[in-house]
UniProtKB/Swiss-Prot annotation:
It comes from Bordetella avium (strain 197N). The lineage of its organism: Bacteria, Pseudomonadati, Pseudomonadota, Betaproteobacteria, Burkholderiales. HAMAP family: DnaA_bact (MF_00377). PROSITE patterns: DNAA. This is Chromosomal replication initiator protein DnaA. Domain I is involved in oligomerization and binding regulators, domain II is flexibile and of varying length in different bacteria, domain III forms the AAA+ region, while domain IV binds dsDNA. Residues 71-145 are annotated as: Domain II.
Amino acid sequence: MKEFWQTCVSRLEQELPPQQISAWIRPLVPLAYDEAQAVLRVAAPNRFKLDWVRKNFSHQIEALAAEWYQRPVQVQFELPSHSTTPRIPVTPRAAVAPVAPASAAPLAPAAPPVAAAYSAPPEPPAAPAQTSAAVDAANIVYERSRLNTDLTFENFVTGKANQLARAAALQVAENPGTSYNPLFLYGGVGLGKTHLIHAIGNAMVAAGTGVRVRYVHADQYVSDVVKAYQRKAFDDFKRYYHSLDLLLIDDIQFFSGKNRTQEEFFYAFEAMVAQRKQIIITSDTYPKELSGIDSRLISRFDSGLTVAIEPPELEMRVAILLRKAESEGVPMPEEVAFFIAKHLRSNVRELEGALRKVLAYARFHGREALNVDVCKEALKDLLSVSNGQITVENIQKTVADFYKIKVADMYSKRRPANIALPRQVAMYLAKELTQKSLPEIGDLFGGRDHTTVLHAVRKISDARAKQAELNHTLHVLEQTLKG
């Protein structure tokens, strides 16, 4: 048991960065190996580390254990009991004799004992009170961070729609507080903004550098400001938020009209950026399109890196469905994933909801194998909505609502900028999303000539290729119209 664990750690040192070894592997304590059941019991110091190691490293440890014991082994992680448990020492890598590459040195009990390479004496067991205090402290830190450990870079499905956002998020996780500060991610509901910012937080915590992290939804931040005001505790409020190394603010559009909240956030923003501490913000829209937000804040948001997350393309939607089905332990044929992805195009949340509906339908109706017919039956309500005809009238109403103008302005002869652009956008979408000819579209826009429609289509098409903000707006409108 002792020899196996030392060898296991040595092998993991060859595969993982030193920070991950220090943060996640060294704190683990092997408790016992049950030969009859082929179960290896390993203790983690607190619930946060237990959950993280189980999700991210259990497969590697189980593979090494299976190689050592020459049979499949289940690794069972648990929290330490209050009784003391002897700790198997693991000395830093510098004290270890050179180890051959993993492929050249198979694990086997007959190999020379790896523990012989260690000269350090065993560490004394931690006292129960100290262990309990450490667990409590770690849990408190984790609770304060509010991170969801399920949301990582490893299980984030990447495609054209979000590859730039993921690349920026990875860069920030590896080099916080430098060039991309703040990082501002924007896009529609259910496209993965929240997943990405949790992934950044989890990656920084996993690096084991002791960073102080806080994820907070904008509504909760507003609530924190109100409580600080009621309790006359603004000094404590400022001290806490200004002390963070990483602040993740989700859905900042909810700050709209809340002047005191915006003022406090402005002070926190200035203090953190001055100390090269990282701020990451998400929103449903581009910074300059935020309403009810102080211009000073909008200027600060624009000072870093702003990245859009677009609705997922077909291939990405298929990959998301296959990954989700795999995580649920359900084999899904690709043609089934393609069928769902072709008919549901708006966001990741909708896709996952549709998959849950299909799985539940199959389970309740005794359908063992997933196929397209099962999907059609399970999703008939959703499919009837998503297959609805897109009309020019529907486009005009949707665009008018988005730009906050009257539908009648679509037909009028008025040409101020706040009306001309939405009208051209609506003409462009009518050409892209319906079978109407240019003259027919012109008639539906107040009897305009087909050359006017053609000019609008070309103008918006060219602008879309050059302006990220307009491209994002068009994506939002297209997905809204397609359902």
